[in-house]
């Protein structure tokens, strides 16, 4: 059985009236260890035949077998395996990757074989040394002469063993001396047992082969053996290694090439990232603003009392009949305070009237409350003391004032111990509250607090309260407590003539509202991310077009479609991840500036938003990078190699 066997191979280019018959019923066989020169003039079809033999192209009809296996039935990755494991290509124009060193160019086929990094580099160095390039391992193609580049190409062809060497006009771009050197190397490869198939138009070059096949107008016109065949010997073949290092090395190589591609076009890459940067920065900043404002509002709500339920007369806020309902009493507050889930209950009554100190009259609001009211509402004392349980029991004529009252009446003096009149009733100032700055603004209303017994018995003369504030124990469910209080009061009053305001309901409403707003604004900001993703896809399509030749070279040395797909997909994801990280950094910088100048509420960048931003940018890279990457992976090797 012959190593290579072709029967009735035909190849056509074009279609319809422009269809050209390039190869016409080509039949030949090549034995293991042959050195075959295919000679012919330009346009004769010799290069097309070699491309088919090298599995870079496919025949229009006919049979092509390698070791008896029909190649027409092979999938693209199976053909890539042949090129990777058994073939080695020496091109007329060298086809080296300009961004890689000589060592890396030579080692590249072994990446797709799964060879470890150290072993790969050592083998590449040995091949370069054997070809007289030991001192050029770190040089890039642009730093080498034509002859040196071709020797690098030969070393690359041998990296995975190169059982069958395909040489396409190997001396065509070289001077005479370099050409002779290259031909001497090829002859030595043949003598070492490699099967060599060489294409040339020069009879002098063809004379180096032991068999010459001449093609004219797509047909074989002669097939002669000029020299005795050299007995074939086994050529060492590198075995593919399917291990974790196999996938790791391929990923590292793809990542490195992606970084080089991004850095090769810095400005273009930056402009491509711009849409991602703006989108991510917008989303993270909006979420940070939402988090900051939500946190501030919830803190303010907490400062007004957490786990609290306020009970009011009537059916709800704005109920005109609530003023006529007088069933909410001190006894209700006392019964409520005895419930197992209640920490405390404080009634509250209020009265508006004239506040007088010396010759100054002001309009103020006096609130009659229990001694626990301040703790429940989170109000802080600045100076003096708060009234206690005894003050409540004894109807003590004491009062605690707010900062507004202090500023109006005692701007230049200490208010403690002073007597003020409210609705002509004397009250002694025993304490001053701190300014209560919360999300609902700073009221200019003058506020005072006295024991509810004092207000009810000495000022309003009423026996009912305006409200009852209930503090629920920390281990109790406020929803269950609210339901229990409602049933208790309904039983006492005989009707539901009250309504409740649960602080947790306000908290949940704020969280829900701010969450909805964050989602809405983030959705708008996401539009810029989509635009950025389209920009990435556009640039990646341009990159595929620009690097078509590189794709062809990688396929020729054995890259699978998955390898090409992976490389371009990594490049797209890399651009988006870098853009995402820069966007997060930009948002962090904005938040620092914002928090420096704005003190009402901070921008709060959470770890979740950062992780989400990076994940989102990665997803955009995958989503918008897949089409260009898939286009690159589906290129035909010979078509890709033909691009300049």
UniProtKB/Swiss-Prot annotation:
Domain ABC transporter: 4-242
Disulfide bonds: none
Enzyme Commission numbers on file: 7.6.2.-
Pfam families xrefs: ABC_tran, FtsX, MacB_PCD
The keyword Transport is assigned to this record: yes
Keyword set, alphabetical order: Antibiotic resistance, ATP-binding, Cell inner membrane, Cell membrane, Membrane, Nucleotide-binding, Translocase, Transmembrane, Transmembrane helix, Transport
UniProt-recorded name of the protein: Macrolide export ATP-binding/permease protein MacB
